[in-house]
Curated annotation (Swiss-Prot):
Keywords: Kelch repeat, Repeat. SMART domains: Kelch. This is Kelch domain-containing protein 8A. Gene3D superfamilies: Kelch-type beta propeller. It comes from Mus musculus (Mouse). It holds the Pfam family Kelch_KLHDC2_KLHL20_DRC7. The lineage of its organism: Eukaryota, Metazoa, Chordata, Craniata, Vertebrata. Kelch repeats lie at residues 1-31, 32-79, 81-127, 128-175, 176-222, 224-278, 279-326.
Length: 350
């Protein structure tokens, strides 16, 4: 696949969200993007639920989420959207699970989680949902792996994760669930563990070389990229924004040795990232001082270097993001206050 030139990338402003927010969750299904929950200007979780239609460039409000919450885990099962856990209006984790039927336009309560939790990582395969980790009411990280059986409407406990954590990144590849990073209380975890759905067992993979919070993970071809982030301050060490890039080779099963010349051009944490047209993209986030960034860059996997992209029209951090129809969408987040901006990075045909 021919990797596009950075000059061919452009940003486009799309219809803004109906209200400003942060920590909303995005999901693509049936060629549309759904935005669920989030926090308002006062940090109060919201019950908003909207769908974006790319043809009309329009957000349409749908029946409100029965339980207002932010930072929910979401997944699509055919024409149903499942919303799991998150933070409720009392600022505490919830155990509520709700399912929206797209054809009927209705919400239904489903069997609750075994314990209230926020920061759960969710993957789905063959109409089965797998929920890993989370943080409970006592602020302790969970090591639970639970599988939801849609036909029986019940959660079944599977082998616990070797490293308890919340806010991890998980993705499915074949019949394996890869779980990376996350946090325990305020501190970052560099554990990398893989659950085999068929053998129902966990394998520990080599740890992420650089431990940091607010980094991003992107998969592209047979590589997994761990990007940027914040090295947390402890005792005498100051917190530090990072340019670091670690790359895991899925075929060889190991982290590659990285030259400093392969690192990001700009130090950043809490940014938008995704794989787009054969390149790894990072945009916005928080940088030194700390300042909200507008800069964006694209990694060329053959040249092993980052190149500058056009800046984001609205500089911001803590955006929700999704790769959708060959675009990387940056939704909401924090600029000077909360933002309702929706912007798409795409490769122009010209």
């Amino acid at each position: 696949m021919e990797v596009p030139n950075v000059k061919d990338f452009q940003w486009k402003r799309l219809a803004p969200l109906p209200s400003r927010r942060v920590y909303c969750s995005l999901l693509e299904t049936g060629g549309q993007v759904y935005a669920i929950g989030g926090c308002d200007d006062n940090g109060v979780p919201m019950d908003c639920f909207e769908v974006y239609s790319p043809e009309a460039d329009q957000w349409t409000s749908l029946p409100s989420l029965p339980t207002a919450r932010a930072g929910v885990a979401i997944t699509a099962l055919g024409k149903r959207i499942m919303v799991i856990g998150g933070v409720g209006t009392n600022q505490l984790p919830v155990k509520v699970v709700e399912m929206y039927n797209i054809d009927e336009g209705k919400w239904k309560k489903r069997s609750v989680l075994r314990e209230a939790a926020m920061g759960i990582s969710v993957t789905a395969k063959d109409y089965r949902v797998y929920a890993a980790g989370g943080m409970g009411l006592d602020l302790r990280p969970h090591n639970y792996l639970q599988h939801y059986d849609m036909l029986k409407d019940m959660w079944v406990s599977l082998a616990p994760m070797p490293t308890p954590r919340y806010a991890a990144t998980s993705f499915l590849r074949g019949s394996k669930i890869y779980v990376l990073g996350g946090r325990q209380s305020k501190y970052a975890v560099n554990a990398f563990e893989v659950f085999d759905i068929e053998s129902r067992s966990w394998t520990k993979f080599p740890n992420i070389p650089c431990k940091r919070a607010f980094s991003s993970f992107v998969t592209l071809d047979n590589h997994l990229y761990s990007l940027g982030g914040l090295r947390q301050g402890r005792l005498y060490r100051q917190p530090k924004f990072l340019r670091t890039m670690d790359v895991f080779d899925m075929e060889q099963g190991g982290w590659l040795k990285m030259e400093r010349s392969f690192f990001l051009k700009k130090r950043r944490a809490d940014f938008v990232a995704g794989g787009l047209s054969g390149r790894v993209i990072v945009a916005g986030g928080l940088g030194n001082q700390p300042t909200v960034l507008e800069t964006a860059e694209a990694f060329h996997p053959e040249k092993n270097k980052w190149e500058a992209l056009p800046p984001m029209p609205t500089p911001r951090c803590a955006c929700s993001s999704i790769v959708f129809k060959n675009c990387l969408l940056a939704v909401g987040g924090v600029s000077q206050g909360l933002s309702d901006a929706v912007e798409a990075l795409f490769v122009s045909d010209s």
